[in-house]
């Protein structure tokens, strides 16, 4: 009987299994069917509780469940699902162990920043206009960079070319953008483009490395730029990459602006060692390196200048301008060392020329000339002369008779005692007829009776050593070089203030047919204002207007330097308001400096009131000036007696403290802020017609 019951049970299992497959929902663990369908869990027939019952009872329970209420089945299934989901969760409720997650404010800020970037990051739109080529983008970026629109060029390349059109860039695309970054010193972006270029397996060219060294030279942060340039140079040396002369010039420019003259000479020797022919442009970068030494740079520049002339190179106009910059900014160094190196005749050609090889006559004339120039340039001898110590330069003392030729000896005896030496003084700027004229630009032009330098401290003194205004221009004429407006502006800065040479500068403009600019006149106005000649500075304004020039803020700033009286300074501010020109912080700084020098605190308070009325932001220089003016004297004793000066400074201190609370501060902008591309936030709201604008098609 038991076997019969088992047979009936298994005979009903096959249609039951088919029925299960037809009504089983794959997404949930319960029956899915109509009202007549079974609504019970899949695991119910196979549970452990049902297997313990007898077969008869199990059959009765199954038949009873088939005829039961569907709502009861649903509640049972839901309860069993909840129990299944809460399985293993009771330990968290009754356990005494607590779990902690590491979290910091920086971590939350980082996660918040990532979410914000994901939300604000614009989705790149696919390009729907006419497709362009990488060469077309190269021409467009080159045109924008030439117009000074570096931001537009970067946006055109990164957004339209790479993201929208999804074109594969060429080496020329990256090189053009790196060159544009090099003009403005955008170091970070230039090396970022260089790294992207290497990731795309594009081979950099000589122009790429030239642009990279140039961006290091123009960077506002010299230390980091020097490290980047040295690292790039080491990478090129590891790859045995041969640089051309243009790239070496960019490297030499970087060494001149970011390092010192010694590194310039190292690069210079490498140029000679590689067989390149040096030009006057090479010596121009060496002159830049000389200018970096503010103490002895003028003497270095004269030695480099003489070497350039001894090699037969004609100096260019830029070389003359750099020599004037050295005369304006750099000193002569030790006068005794300068006298030994610049006044004594030296056989530089013999020292710098190595023995000639016997195989040179077999070569061509062009190769012979190039090798002769490279052979004459013995940089080690020049380096020894440049960095000569005082003890090495002087050596054992020599009697004056040994230094002065016999023909000039009687003339010296009639003028001075034999034990004294003739000295070159700053009076050489306006020499009398009987006084010696000196021009150190030509070694043979130094008279033998001039054996040492006198006091050479001002730019006018250093200009006198190269012949003065007329002697300098005559040397330019010998080398067939005409002065430009930059040359005349530099001459206006180095000539002696109030001298006849300064009045000749306006005549030189017409003589050489040079068109004057505002910088030239601003230089003349500033020099007269520094002398206290405010009326003479104002007299230049009609001359400026006659040449069709309009004064700018720099012109008013130069006029403010000479406003030592309150009447002049306040009148200048009134005239600027009538001209609808708002003074900036530099003009107020010049007026504050003039008031502090006169210790006129009433004048100073009036300047601060006008600055407050115009809401001009305060910079660091103005704060430093006002803090100095608000200090008490070191020997101040309040109880010693009544002091009118101290009563005024107390009133200024009280007003200055209240003035600081209401004045806005001027923020110094980042040098690269204006070159950074901004994300396109309104990509979805822009019209579709904008895709076919000027930069969209050919």
From Swiss-Prot:
Residues 62-78 have a biased composition (Polar residues). The keyword Flavoprotein does not apply. Keywords: Mitochondrion, Repeat, tRNA processing. GO terms for cellular component: mitochondrial matrix. Residues 678-690 have a biased composition (Basic and acidic residues). Gene3D superfamilies: Tetratricopeptide repeat domain. One of its GO terms (molecular function) is tRNA binding. It is found in: Mitochondrion; Mitochondrion matrix. Its main location: mitochondrion. InterPro entries: Pentatricopeptide_rpt, PROP1-like_PPR_dom, TPR-like_helical_dom_sf. It holds the Pfam family PPR_long. GO terms for biological process: tRNA 3'-end processing. PROSITE patterns: PPR. It comes from the Eukaryota. PPR repeats lie at residues 133-169, 170-204, 205-243, 244-278, 279-315, 316-352, 517-551, 552-583, 584-618. Disulfide bonds: none annotated. Residues 49-88, 392-419, 670-698 are annotated as: Disordered. The keyword Protein biosynthesis does not apply. Belongs to the PTCD1 family. Mitochondrial protein implicated in negative regulation of leucine tRNA levels, as well as negative regulation of mitochondria-encoded proteins and COX activity. Also affects the 3'-processing of mitochondrial tRNAs. Associates with mitochondrial leucine tRNAs. Interacts with ELAC2. This is Pentatricopeptide repeat-containing protein 1, mitochondrial. It comes from Pongo abelii (Sumatran orangutan). The lineage of its organism: Eukaryota, Metazoa, Chordata, Craniata, Vertebrata.
């Amino acid at each position: 009987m038991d076997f019969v019951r088992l047979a009936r049970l298994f005979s009903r299992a096959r249609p039951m299994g088919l029925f299960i497959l037809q009504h089983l929902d794959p997404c949930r663990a319960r029956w899915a069917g109509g009202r007549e369908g079974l609504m019970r869990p899949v695991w119910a027939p196979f549970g452990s509780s049902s297997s313990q019952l007898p077969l008869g009872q199990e059959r009765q329970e199954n038949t009873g469940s088939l005829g039961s209420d569907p709502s009861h089945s649903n509640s049972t299934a839901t309860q069993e699902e909840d129990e299944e989901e809460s399985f293993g969760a009771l330990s968290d409720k009754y356990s005494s162990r607590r779990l902690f997650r590491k979290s910091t404010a920086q971590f939350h800020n980082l996660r918040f920043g990532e979410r914000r970037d994901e939300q604000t990051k614009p989705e790149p739109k696919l390009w729907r206009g006419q497709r362009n080529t990488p060469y077309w983008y190269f021409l467009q970026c080159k045109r924008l960079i030439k117009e000074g629109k570096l931001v537009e060029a970067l946006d055109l390349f990164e957004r339209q070319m790479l993201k929208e059109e999804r074109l594969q860039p060429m080496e020329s695309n990256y090189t053009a953008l790196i060159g544009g970054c090099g003009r403005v010193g955008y170091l970070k972006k230039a090396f970022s483009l260089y790294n992207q270029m290497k990731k795309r397996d594009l081979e950099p060219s000589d122009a790429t490395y030239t642009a990279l060294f140039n961006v290091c030279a123009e960077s506002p942060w010299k230390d980091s730029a020097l490290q980047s340039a040295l690292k790039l140079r080491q990478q090129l040396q590891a790859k045995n990459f041969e640089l051309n002369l243009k790239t070496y010039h960019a490297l030499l420019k970087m060494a001149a602006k970011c390092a010192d003259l010694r590194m310039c000479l190292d690069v210079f020797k490498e140029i000679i060692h590689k067989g390149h022919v040096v030009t006057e442009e090479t010596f121009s970068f060496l002159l830049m390196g000389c200018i970096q030494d503010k103490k002895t740079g003028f003497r270095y520049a004269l030695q480099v200048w003489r070497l350039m002339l001894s090699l037969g190179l004609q100096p260019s106009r830029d070389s003359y301008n750099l020599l004037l910059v050295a005369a304006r900014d750099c000193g002569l160094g030790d006068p005794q060392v300068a006298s030994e190196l610049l006044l004594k005749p030296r056989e530089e050609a013999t020292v710098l020329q190595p023995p000639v090889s016997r195989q040179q006559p077999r070569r061509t004339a062009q190769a012979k000339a190039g090798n002769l120039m490279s052979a004459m340039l013995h940089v080690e001898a020049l380096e020894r002369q440049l960095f000569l110590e005082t003890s090495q330069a002087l050596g054992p003392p020599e009697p004056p008779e040994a230094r002065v030729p016999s023909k000039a000896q009687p003339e010296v005896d009639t003028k001075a005692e034999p034990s004294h030496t003739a000295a070159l003084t700053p009076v050489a700027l306006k020499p009398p007829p009987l006084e010696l004229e000196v021009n150190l630009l030509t070694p043979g032009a130094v008279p033998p009776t001039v054996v040492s330098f006198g006091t050479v401290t001002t730019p006018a003194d250093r200009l006198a050593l190269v012949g003065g205004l007329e002697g300098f221009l005559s040397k330019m004429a010998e080398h067939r070089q005409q002065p430009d407006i930059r040359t005349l502006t530099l001459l206006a800065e180095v000539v002696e203030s109030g001298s006849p040479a300064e009045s000749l500068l306006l005549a030189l403009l017409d003589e050489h047919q040079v068109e004057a600019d505002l910088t030239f006149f601003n230089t003349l106005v500033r020099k007269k204002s520094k002398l206290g000649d405010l009326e003479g500075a104002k007299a230049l304004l009609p001359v400026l207007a006659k040449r069709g020039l309009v004064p700018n803020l720099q012109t008013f700033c130069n006029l403010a330097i000479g406003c030592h009286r309150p009447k002049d300074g306040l009148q200048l501010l009134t005239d600027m308001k009538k001209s609808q020109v708002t003074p900036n912080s530099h003009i107020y700084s010049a007026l504050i400096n003039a008031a502090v020098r006169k210790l006129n605190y009433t004048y100073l308070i009036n300047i601060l009131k006008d600055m407050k009325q115009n809401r001009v932001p305060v910079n660091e220089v103005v704060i430093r000036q006002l803090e100095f003016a608000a200090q008490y004297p070191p020997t101040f004793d309040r109880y010693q007696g009544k002091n009118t000066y101290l009563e005024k400074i107390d009133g200024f201190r009280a007003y200055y403290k209240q003035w600081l609370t209401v004045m806005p501060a001027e923020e110094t902008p980042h040098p690269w802020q204006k070159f950074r591309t901004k994300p396109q936030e309104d990509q979805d709201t822009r019209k579709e017609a904008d895709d076919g604008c000027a930069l969209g098609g050919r």
